């Protein structure tokens, strides 16, 4: 709370232990999820979640320094990440159907690593398409390819 409380007077922080990133892997880290809730917090999200990703990076770095070990922390603001994940999964399924029908690959816009991962996971069992990340740095994007 102290770490994030300075950001807004009316913000509350809800903390919970999340599900492991890879439920099939018993050694996968279990994240600490912090959801900052309150009015007028869009500035914490920023354009396409860039400010939120930066905030999460800073919090992880501060906690790692304090605790002298890495801590898997996921920060969300008014459930932005949950909503964005749902949007990405719906978009992935919609574009996968277009790729399957047309038989031609389609590249998505450049995305952050966690968003690309969401696309890969959403389509990993799709019978008609496969995914591949292409490009470098902040220009890296997912291409959906017919099988």
Q: Where do the PLM segments sit?
A:
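RNA-contacting regions in translation and RNA-metabolism proteins
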Residues: 1-147
């Amino acid at each position: 709370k102290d770490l994030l409380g300075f950001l807004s007077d009316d913000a509350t922080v809800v903390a919970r232990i999340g599900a492991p990133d890879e439920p099939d892997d018993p050694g996968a880290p279990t994240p600490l999820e912090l959801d900052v809730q309150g009015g007028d917090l869009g500035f914490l999200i920023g354009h396409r979640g860039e400010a939120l990703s930066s905030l999460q990076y800073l919090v992880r770095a501060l906690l790692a320094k304090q605790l002298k070990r890495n801590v898997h922390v996921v920060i969300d603001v008014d459930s932005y990440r949950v909503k964005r994940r749902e949007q990405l999964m719906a978009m992935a399924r919609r574009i996968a159907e277009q790729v399957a029908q047309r038989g031609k690959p389609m590249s998505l816009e450049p995305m952050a690593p966690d968003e690309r991962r969401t696309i890969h996971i959403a389509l990993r069992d799709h019978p008609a398409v496969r995914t591949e990340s292409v490009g470098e740095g902040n220009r890296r994007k997912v291409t959906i390819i017919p099988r």
